[in-house]
Amino acid sequence: DYSVTPALAAGDPVKVSDTKYEITLRDGAKFSDGTDVKAADVVSSYERTTDEKSIYRQFFTFVDSVEAKDDNTITIKLKHPFANLKERFVNVRVVPASMDEDSLKAKPIGTGPYKYENITATEVTAVPNEYYNGNEPAKAPTLKWQSLKDDSARLAAAIGGTVDIMEAVPASAQDQLKGAGWNVESKPGYGN
């Protein structure tokens, strides 16, 4: 349903004032390499996300600062009140502050229920993260993402049954997919 629920956080952001929030990390949160997740990692990840080269920077213009209050608490100060704080912060992919960009591209480390097992130019494979202690553990033994950039290749894979989920469905293909038994959903983006 595309609703946002806490994953790495212990709960929703706590409103301190109209322009200040605090987020507490989940007890015992670890990265997929087994190291502890700290508030400094979240701050560093926010800084990566809002770097001038990042496509996600545009989604955080309402933020004044993000700081580590202590090892488990992040303080977010806003330039003005903003109702969709938690929905925007899902764009911050939390990674170890100590990792450089090349290491993250070669073997990404995260905090979710899955960890990367294999990455190629056309496919990504993920398996359950044994260090994950959140509310939504991995349910499938393996997840695979294929990079099918061509609309006709994605459509053929969907109708042929070699994929279970498809993003960016061409409007002209919706009826064909529905006719093949697919459930086609349309969800608004940030600008809608």
Regions found by a protein language model. Name each.
Residues 3, 89-138, 142:
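Gly/Pro-rich hinge or "lid" segments in bacterial periplasmic/extracellular proteins
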Residues 17-19, 26-28, 42, 47, ...:
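Solvent-exposed coil/turn segments that connect beta secondary-structure elements
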Residues 102, 131-176:
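Ligand-site clamp/hinge motif
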Residues 1-16, 25, 47, 109:
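N-terminal lobe/hinge region of extracytoplasmic solute-binding protein
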Residues 59, 167-192:
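Local pocket/hinge segments that shape ligand/substrate recognition
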Residues 27-30, 47-54, 94, 150, ...:
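Sec-exported extracytoplasmic/periplasmic mature domains
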Residues 20-24, 58-98:
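Surface-exposed binding/hinge segments that line
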